[in-house]
Swiss-Prot record:
Cofactor note: Binds 1 zinc ion per subunit.
Family: Belongs to the class-I aminoacyl-tRNA synthetase family. IleS type 1 subfamily.
Cofactor: Zn(2+)
Enzyme class, spelled out: ligase
Domain comment as written in the entry: IleRS has two distinct active sites: one for aminoacylation and one for editing. The misactivated valine is translocated from the active site to the editing site, which sterically excludes the correctly activated isoleucine. The single editing site contains two valyl binding pockets, one specific for each substrate (Val-AMP or Val-tRNA(Ile)).
Keyword list, A-Z: Aminoacyl-tRNA synthetase, ATP-binding, Cytoplasm, Ligase, Metal-binding, Nucleotide-binding, Protein biosynthesis, Zinc
Locus of motif 'KMSKS' region: 605-609
Location of this chain's protein in the cell: Cytoplasm
Motif ('HIGH' region): 58-68
Residues annotated to bind Zn(2+): 903, 906, 923, 926
Species whose genome carries this gene: Shewanella sp. (strain ANA-3)
Official protein name in the record: Isoleucine--tRNA ligase
A GO CC annotation given for this chain: cytosol
Length: 940
């Protein structure tokens, strides 16, 4: 017996079956860095149309978490796919480097500025700490396979960026959007600073809910307004509040002009009380107060009570009833306790009536020394003392512990207060900023589209933006204010330009070191330097100008895309929109894409206390970054993104399917040189031409999905192609031809040409997602090529040719369906132990006329499609009793074990085996492939 094994074209490749990604990816990263891969990509796109994705800067504090990974991987997929589409798509990563969290970390190390360390030294320590944090996060991001300008990222603490932030503020001022005011702002007593909207979280809190009586200064006259003459009891208006500590700042009682208000007399414990309440709430209030009996003495509209005076319950002054649109009857009494220094609505309505904006509370949440009754007490601890004083004064009608949603500091997780302080604001309405921003929102594409209505509502309802902070580590608000008039210096814009030039050379410390006389000369005595710093949301929100507008690789093109988590509608998307519109009248972006948050397999937020945190570092060390990247791409990011060990293992299974497909392609391109072996598409075997045509159609679908940022559709189509069209059909069928046909013959080279085209296309399809694996495939593909797939464009040689004589795509799809039915019957025969494998079978297909015409069209090559040694087609009417019905009404099948001898080389059972004297163990086909010109295949 001859050894025919050496006459077979066995698959061979250096591409291993196991990816071993956790170990191999770092080796690839070293090569990428050594070769300057990112710069190679940049050089390959010189002069092309730019596509600018601007990186929203993560905060330079702590290790990256799974949410960071999702964000960076999505950005990387977009940048790489846009590059593949021919764009010049630079990616400059950035970091947010100023602000309180860094200050707090540095304080733990060196103490607060002014104690053991000067403010200048403290800032330098903050700068060092932020740089260390950037280094740690950068290494983790690079490990994910994210390509970018990692050696020259943008940092908001770079001197040039700090200077540009100041320049952007000067433009906002020049355009008339800045004003100073005393306004209630979110204030964290632990931070000792104002908070931005985006720094506020809502959590449940238990507060004292109290009903407080404000007695009228002239009860008899007030009762008369309700139609009750000569009334002898004191009449009180009742408020309901959950912040007793704000009562020292009360300056009015707000009522609704349109509501009906009732004068109610009720008896309790032998005493008679007369109170004014919203009519619709009378019954609820009487129940709450434990009234033994009550009667409504009269009703009036709220507007009739405007400016009636009431005595403060424990301070020696009286306050007016005023009209406010913010009054509701959802809870309480229909009368709102109004403290303009401690509430936004209170402040707005107070401005209309010229009320004092009283703020008896210091930065640390403690009442100031001149606060009667409560000086030196912390506001939240004073709540009980306020309640006790009200009880003592006879003004407390009801008191209960009340659980409700309350604003908390996102850093300290502690309750915050509204507190009026002198601050700098960007006005939403003075120069029509709100109106302009809403108009720009309409010009922007929001993905998903619900993002538009979300940010519109936020802009419609947001107050002026308080951009000042009382911090040490931040970009200074570089203004000079007149010591007496508090007016800005008339040359503020030009002065800021000179200060910015200094900051560009020396950093923000230049402002603190600056002697005002250097810039103002003799005027210096009349002006003081502002010591406030900018809200860090201003830092990041101005980077479209301070970074994108300044760095040469962006070509002054402007930003095409912002991409962040859905919490950034009120964060970075909002601050960027406000600053850009204030500076230029235009939005800073053309598209805004948001992704959901990561949750565990049960839909819960990641939490160390629950123990469900999945660290990206652990995933890359165990499974590899490509598995994490595949999970990100395969997940519909428009909603919550579910991740768990089980889900990642499923991604690893999906990855193996793609890897195995790539390995099959490479292994079967062994010995193929496209320069001399490539068969023109029009000369290919019909099935090969179909495979190329199918790949061409799929490539269009994949490119479209990339363009629409639908990466989960890319992965779905890729998996379908690998598993069904290739794995279960095309690759399965061609194995016989690939392994047994003449090595240099047309039948094999046709097949290899199709595999080559598919591999060239597929390596590009996967490159944005499975970047490491794509690089690995690229290095092993035959033919002359550039060093990296990442400098390429989508494969152009997938010619979708259909010849007049060709079988249609529908034909092959029908054949795939028939093949699936045949496989079911063969599998049953194998389970019944009637045959060993499919090549041990002879199949008879009983088909109707239409199907018979299709099946017989490819003649004897039908058996190669069905992977059987023999395939006969007979009329459906001739079906035997042993024939098995299929899911196709037009087809019945009969499978029998073949009686023919088995060819030693191809394993097909053929009648002629044993009849060829020189090769008694071979079939005719194999002899032709060994000694002749090779078999002829037309169809499969």
């Amino acid at each position: 017996m001859s050894d025919y094994k050496f006459t077979l074209n066995l698959p061979e490749t250096e591409f291993p079956m196991r990816g071993n990604l956790a170990n191999r990816e770092p080796e690839m990263l070293e090569r990428w860095t050594k070769d300057g891969l990112y710069q190679q990509i940049r050089d390959s796109r010189i002069g092309r149309t730019p596509f600018i994705l601007h990186d929203g800067p993560p905060y330079a504090n702590g290790s990256i978490h799974i949410g960071h990974s999702v964000n960076k991987i999505l950005k990387d997929i977009i940048v790489k796919s846009k590059t593949m589409s021919g764009f010049d798509a630079p990616y400059v990563p950035g970091w947010d480097c100023h602000g309180l969290p860094i200050e707090l970390k540095v304080e733990q190390k060196v103490g607060k500025p002014g104690q053991k360390i000067s403010a200048a030294e403290f800032r330098e320590e903050c700068r060092k700490y932020a740089a260390e944090q950037v280094d740690g996060q950068r290494a983790d991001f690079i490990r994910l396979g994210v390509l970018g300008d990692w050696q020259k990222p943008y940092l908001t603490m770079d001197f040039a960026t700090e200077a540009n932030i100041v320049r952007s503020l000067s433009k906002v001022i020049e355009n008339g959007h800045l004003h100073k005011g005393v306004k209630p702002v979110h204030w964290c007593t632990d931070c000792g600073s104002a908070l931005a909207e985006a720094e506020v979280e809502y959590e449940d809190k238990t507060s004292p809910a109290i009903d407080v009586a404000f007695t009228a200064t002239d009860s008899k006259a007030l009762a008369a307004q309700f139609g009750v003459s000569d009334y002898s009891h004191p009449v009180a208006m009742v408020i309901w509040t959950t912040t007793p500590w704000t009562l020292p700042a009360n300056r009015a009682l707000s009522i609704s002009p349109e509501l009906d208000y009732s004068l109610v007399e009720f008896a309790k414990e032998g005493a008679t009380h007369a109170v004014i309440l919203a009519d619709v709430l009378v019954e609820a209030c009487m129940t709450r107060y434990g009234a033994e009996s009550h009667s409504v003495l009269g009703k009036v509209k709220g507007v009739a009570l405007e400016l009636v005076r009431f005595k403060h319950p424990f301070l020696a002054f009286d306050v007016p009833a005023i009209l406010g649109d913010h009054v509701t009857t959802d809870a309480g009494t229909g009368v709102v306790h109004t403290a303009p220094g401690h509430g936004q609505d209170d402040f707005v309505v107070g401005q209309k009536y010229g009320l004092e904006v009283a703020n008896p509370v210091g930065d640390n949440g403690v009442y100031k020394p001149d606060t009667e009754f409560f000086a030196g007490q912390h506001v939240f601890k004073a709540n009980d003392n306020v309640v006790a004083l009200l009880k003592e004064k006879g003004a407390l009608l009801h008191h209960v512990a009340y659980r409700h949603s309350y604003p908390h500091c996102w850093r300290h997780k502690t309750p915050i207060i509204f507190r009026a302080t002198p601050q700098w604001f960007i006005s939403m309405d003075n120069q029509n900023l709100r109106k302009q921003a809403l108009s720009e929102i309409e010009q922007t594409q929001w993905i998903p589209d619900w993002g538009q209505s979300r940010i519109e509502k936020m802009v419609e309802n947001r107050p002026d933006w308080c951009i000042s902070r009382q911090r040490t580590w931040g970009v200074p608000i570089t203004l000079f204010v007149h010591r007496e008039t508090e007016e800005l210096h008339p040359d503020s814009v030009s002065l800021m330009a000179r200060v910015a030039n200094r900051i560009e050379q020396e950093g923000i410390q230049a402002w603190w070191d600056l002697d005002a006389a250097e810039l103002l000369g003799e005027e210096a005595e009349q002006y003081r330097k502002v010591t406030d710093t900018l809200d860090v949301w201003y830092d990041s929100g101005s980077t479209f100008a301070s970074v994108v507008g300044a760095r040469p690789e962006f070509h002054g093109h402007g930003v095409d895309l912002y991409l962040e988590g859905s919490d950034q509608h009120r964060g970075w998307f909002m601050s960027s929109l406000m600053i850009s519109t204030a500076m230029t009248g235009k939005a800073p972006y053309k598209q805004v894409l948001t992704h959901g948050f990561t949750v565990d397999g049960k839909g819960r937020k990641m939490s160390k206390s629950i123990g469900n945190v999945i660290a990206p570092q652990q995933v890359t060390n165990k499974l590899g970054a490509d598995i994490l990247r595949l999970w990100v791409a395969a997940t519909d990011y428009s909603g919550e993104m579910t991740v768990s060990d089980e889900i990642l293992n499923r991604s690893a299974d999906a990855y193996r399917r793609i890897r195995n497909t790539a390995r099959f392609l490479l292994a079967n391109l062994n010995g193929f040189d496209p320069a001399k072996d490539l068969v023109a598409v029009e000369d290919m075997v019909a099935l090969d031409r179909w495979a190329v045509r199918r790949a061409a159609a799929l490539q269009q679908e994949i490119i479209e999905a990339y363009e629409q940022y639908n990466f989960h559709i890319v992965t779905q189509k890729l998996m379908q192609f690998c598993s069904v069209e290739l794995g279960s059909f095309y690759l399965d069928i061609i194995k016989d031809r690939q392994y047994t046909a003449k090595q240099e013959g047309h039948a094999r080279r046709s097949c290899q040409s199709a595999l080559f085209h598919i591999a060239e296309a597929m390596v590009r399809w996967i490159a944005p997602i499975l970047s490491f694996t794509a690089d690995e495939v690229w290095q092993l593909l035959p033919g002359q090529r550039d060093a990296y797939v990442f400098t390429q464009e989508w494969y152009q040689d997938l010619q979708s040719i259909t010849l007049d004589t060709d079988l249609s795509d529908a034909y092959w799809e029908n054949l795939l369906t028939v093949r699936n039915e045949v496989n079911k019957v063969i599998e049953q025969a194998r389970r019944d132990k009637r045959i060993g494998g499919s090549l041990d079978a002879e199949v008879t297909l009983f088909a109707d006329a239409a199907l018979t015409e299709q099946l017989t069209h490819i003649g004897d090559e039908l058996r190669f499609v069905l992977l059987t040694s023999e395939a006969k087609v007979l009329p459906l009417a001739d079906a035997t009793s042993d024939a098995v019905e299929t899911e196709l009404a037009s087809l019945k099948l009969e499978v029998n074990a073949t009686t023919a001898e088995k060819c030693e080389r191809c394993w097909h059972h053929r009648e002629e085996v044993g009849t060829i004297e020189a090769h008694p163990t071979l079939c005719h086909r194999c002899v032709t492939n060994i000694e002749g010109d090779g078999e002829v295949r037309l169809f499969a």
